């Protein structure tokens, strides 16, 4: 078998001379920090979305034609509904595995959006968007917005009461746009709301157009990551010109494949054990049945919250009236613009035009970190405001009061979050500098000859002639704060949950770790030697 594979490989290489290029690519090194797996959750969620979506398209009809339901769900028998809602019910109750696949599709959509958001937060707070990766930041923003549009269209397709209310709100916001509102509404909905072409257009966009664009952007995103090399956190042996981690074969490919299977398993468990978007409890869309308690999915809830807390300000220009819903669209547009343009805004203010492959700790960039926390607080306040009617109902308070709580909170809390975060970052910086200057606190108290009590510190570097630690420069890497971080606590034992490894196996592990340590030390010495040679520093 191996000879046959070798023969096939030789035949391919003789025609395309791909061996040398493939060898270089499979030797690519990936960092091992856990936060780099956040983007992979989004990737695997999108793959699951494609697979489950293909299955759902086999049984779903997006027609808005009215029919009388006569199916497995008895409470709705004899009720007039659209063909789209009927096929969604049939898919849930009569197609084998249909409900499981539909719920897995919905959970994967939520996971896709949440993982993309958290992934972008990691990129923002660590400065991974800086030059030369501005293009990837823009691609990520476009992916986030396309994911929101794709999800909104997806849960609008069943034509249930909740999705219909969401579409009606979106229709009103689009119509409130000056000049282009009417034309944009016609382009999206195909006429007045609801129109006969509405779901057909959503279906084409949801199944063909937007997934194709997302797939192309993901490919471009991964290609840029591969070509520009991966960022990494500062640490021993890590520079702007190298990457420390594991090779793609065999370690990384095994880790990422296992992580993909875990993602698939978690989504399958969620789909099988928890119910989501139970459209049979909502009934078909009926404009006369619109009520409170109508919230979209979590990634769109902030837009609903903006519509709820925005004052009803109407703008009159001559004989034209701009409705209050326009300000909601304007606010969303401003937030989107700030998100996309932030790398260029920061570059303009700081004047930083250098290439960056090493990441930053959030505490080292307090202004950016504080702005990020401020934006997160603003987003969560809008999200909570999207459910202000539920808060008012369950806590028996005035809905008007809850609306004003959201308005005042949006003005007061984000600046407060900025101030608190900024002070926390400065405090963490002082904590790092204190350890670098004085050493790690040991908890040992020593009595001086004059009767004073002082705490003994463990220096991180050399000491002067008086025994005082020599202050060390901060290199952007985590600073050890406890003696266990330096290995004083020893290493944990090896073995299973209940039994340790035997002595011979433990000795073998220790020997391997010692060899790896010697190899790592030799690598660091060679790296230091090469760096000094490049800088023109002579060896001692």
Curated annotation (Swiss-Prot):
Alphabetical list of InterPro entries matching this protein: Cyt_b/b6_N (IPR005797), Cytb/b6-like_sf (IPR027387), Di-haem_cyt_TM (IPR016174)
Entry's transmembrane regions: 40-60, 109-129, 137-157, 169-189, 207-227, 259-279, 325-345, 371-391, 408-428
Entry keywords, A to Z: Cell membrane, Electron transport, Heme, Iron, Membrane, Metal-binding, Respiratory chain, Translocase, Transmembrane, Transmembrane helix, Transport
Topological relation to the membrane, as annotated: Multi-pass membrane protein
An MF annotation (GO) of this entry: ubiquinol-cytochrome-c reductase activity
Membership in a protein family: Belongs to the cytochrome b family.
Protein name: Cytochrome bc1 complex cytochrome b subunit
Originating species: Corynebacterium diphtheriae (strain ATCC 700971 / NCTC 13129 / Biotype gravis)
Functional note: Cytochrome b subunit of the cytochrome bc1 complex, an essential component of the respiratory electron transport chain required for ATP synthesis. The bc1 complex catalyzes the oxidation of menaquinol and the reduction of cytochrome c in the respiratory chain. The bc1 complex operates through a Q-cycle mechanism that couples electron transfer to generation of the proton gradient that drives ATP synthesis.
Residue positions binding heme 1: 105, 206
One Gene Ontology cellular component: plasma membrane
EC number: 7.1.1.8
Heme is among the record's keywords: yes
Annotated catalysed reactions: a quinol + 2 Fe(III)-[cytochrome c](out) = a quinone + 2 Fe(II)-[cytochrome c](out) + 2 H(+)(out)
UniProt-listed Pfam families: Cytochrom_B_N_2
Cofactor note text: Binds 2 heme groups non-covalently per subunit.
Summary of subunit composition and partner proteins: The cytochrome bc1 complex is composed of a cytochrome b (QcrB), the Rieske protein iron-sulfur (QcrA) and a diheme cytochrome c (QcrC) subunit.
Chief place of localization: membrane
Compartments in which it is found: Cell membrane
Cofactor(s) in the UniProt record: heme
